[in-house]
């Protein structure tokens, strides 16, 4: 009994340490032992079958969307005059949002994967997959903006966002061992080949509306950007006549020429699979069967890194600017002449 209590205690500590960094998890797969993909959630959990094989078009496709802000019931409300119609409830959405909200998207396509049991206690798995992971942060003030840009509290609107997008290939080999006392330990080692990345370390934007007598309703914007990217094609920034960046373009080939695009893809087909953006990852986990009805398990997955090198660029910007309105006299001439021209005198 002491041994069981000790395992439960350490499992609780493990979940406490990692819970703050978890935004989504394959909850539906976790205890589905008849599905080979159970190994993706915990390398110590293995399918009940002796062996499995997956090929392109016959393998698994997984995607997952989560958000920390609102749920479905917060989005719609029934129309008061029409019982069979619904409308978007912006007030309820705003109340459900936090100051910072996260939207995550995960996609995994298995190109090939297989696994087999060795004797009774060992299980080996191997897989190659393409992964897309995105995490987008947005503030509540984007919904609050529907009431206007003026703030009675004097606090500027926070319109800063955060984006982290990674596309990469994963080559993973896993091994687990079942011990005689009901404990199973597993580990999965991953080689990562990055394809593209977009990361905003800082993407801060605030909007304040002035109420001073000398600058009534002036719009004051503060910006602070730090954006980093890596893509599989050569590209660069374009600049205007004042040498300010006004856009970006592909420099390695002409994207409007189908012949050049096809030539580039044929010449670089292998480099898309094995890039210079190399990294490593690891999954570790345990599963302890207490009895026929209860078990305790835990895992840490996707712990690793990718060092981005291919066509890596950084864009930084920090500044302030003020919008004081539009001087209509520049477009319509003198205001008094316009008024006088439209005035009629009655005798």
Residue spans of the language-model regions?
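A generic alpha-helix propensity feature with a strong bias for hydrophobic helices
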Residues: 17, 46, 59, 235-236, ...
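Outer-membrane beta-barrel porins/channels
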Residues: 27-29, 137, 142-347
């Amino acid at each position: 009994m002491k041994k069981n209590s000790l395992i439960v205690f350490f499992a609780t500590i493990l979940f406490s340490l990692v819970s703050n960094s978890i935004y989504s998890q394959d909850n539906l797969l976790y205890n589905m032992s008849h599905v080979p993909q159970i190994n993706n959630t915990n390398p110590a959990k293995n399918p009940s079958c002796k062996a499995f094989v997956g090929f392109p078009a016959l393998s698994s496709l997984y995607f997952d969307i989560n958000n920390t802000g609102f749920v479905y019931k917060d989005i719609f409300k029934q129309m008061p005059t029409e019982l069979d119609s619904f409308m978007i409830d912006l007030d309820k959405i705003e109340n459900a949002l936090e100051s910072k909200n996260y939207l995550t998207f995960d996609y995994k396509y298995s190109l090939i994967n297989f696994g087999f049991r060795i004797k009774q206690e060992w299980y080996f798995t191997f897989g190659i997959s393409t992964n897309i992971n995105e995490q987008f942060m947005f503030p509540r003030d984007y919904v609050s903006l529907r009431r206007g840009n003026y703030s009675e509290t004097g606090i500027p609107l926070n319109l800063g966002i955060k984006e982290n997008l990674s596309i990469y290939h994963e080559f993973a080999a896993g091994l687990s061992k079942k011990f005689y006392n009901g404990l199973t330990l597993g580990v999965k080692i991953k080689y990562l080949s990055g394809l593209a990345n977009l990361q905003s370390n800082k993407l801060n934007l605030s909007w304040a509306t002035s109420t001073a007598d000398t600058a009534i309703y002036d719009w004051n914007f503060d910006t602070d950007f730090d954006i980093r990217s890596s893509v599989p094609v050569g590209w660069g920034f374009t600049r205007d006549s004042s040498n300010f960046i006004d856009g970006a373009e592909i420099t390695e080939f002409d994207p409007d020429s189908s012949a050049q695009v096809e030539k580039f893809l044929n010449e670089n087909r292998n480099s898309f699979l094995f890039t210079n953006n190399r990294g490593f990852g690891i999954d570790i986990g345990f599963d302890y069967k207490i009895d026929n009805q209860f078990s305790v398990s835990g895992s840490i997955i996707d712990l690793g890194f990718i060092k981005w090198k291919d066509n890596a660029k950084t864009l930084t910007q920090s500044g302030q600017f003020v919008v004081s309105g539009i001087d209509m006299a520049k477009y319509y001439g003198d205001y008094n002449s316009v008024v006088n021209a439209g005035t009629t005198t009655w005798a």
